[in-house]
Amino acid sequence: MISSYALLQRDLGILEEVPWAGVVLDEAQNIKNPETKQSRAAHTLKADYRIALTGTPVENSVGDLWSIMEFLNPGLLGSQAEFKKTFFIPIQAQRDPEAVKRLHQLTGPFILRRLKTDKAIITDLPEKMEMKVFCTLTKEQGSLYAAVVEEATQALESAEGIKRKGVVLATLSKLKQVCNHPAQFLGDNSPLPDRSGKLARLVEMVEEMLAAGDRALIFTQFAEMGEILKRHLQETFGQETLFLHGGVPQKQRDVMVDRFQNHPEAPNLFILSLKAGGTGLNLTRANHVFHFDRWWNPAVENQATDRAFRIGQSRRVQVHKFLCVGTLEEKIDEMIERKKEIAAGVVGAGESWLTELSTAELKEIFALRKEALEA
């Protein structure tokens, strides 16, 4: 029997009475929060064996792994409180490699990991080229960025606990919006040209790509930025651009994917929100993947890239990761690169770990370096 997570919740009264031979969860990150109804429903099912399939076992924090392992092997990682003390805090906040090693020793025997780069598993997948695209801010972006940092610095001086975490996460979101485009940050539907270094560079690269007859996926974590990109790219190149986001009905979503993947006259550009389009789609007709803004969990980004870099792809895939030089985007990227072994070991967390940094460390990350502004 095949069921969605929504139907599992609805029909749990019937399904939990069945002595299943096995229960297999696809996209198992859907049970990352043990308090949700769908997570509790999955844990209730009785089966001789359980399997969880996921490309992002740690989507937001290492705590996600506890919920999945608790479904597979109850008690293996202790209670939530024990896990937090033994692994979550040392890994998430302190980036302790010894804690990562201990967690691997416990979970490793129960994990089968397939890498697309392993030629023993997939022999005919073409190469993937990843490159960082460094962009500068316009003067307008620089002024807005400085204003957000000043506001955050004052707020952090007095904020504590949950309020402080809220300030940090809100500031991260605001600064990333500024780096994307002032119109996104201001939300004023203002003109787009000549105001964003990122957008200008994207247009240049898309122009070259279209001239070569290539197709591209463009990922953003912000639905409003997706709308901005769609409008600007359609106006600039005079051709339809698809945009898939969380508000697109399933039927329309299927039509968009089918058009892009199978129709010769379909649009060459497909914008997708990271959450709505980052998993479960086969879009191998694209051979370019643009990450317009970065999600600070490598596994989530890789999942999105794999919409194009997967079995069935016949061309080399070029992955372009946009960063604004001299801003928090570059600094966080540098931190992740320095701790790549830990990030790869337990799949780097999202942005929640940044809330654990000291105020001095946050000021250093938020600060705008001189090289950020265009000459």
Language-model region placement:
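ASCE P-loop NTPase motor core, strongest for the SF2 helicase catalytic module
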Residues: 1-95, 104-375
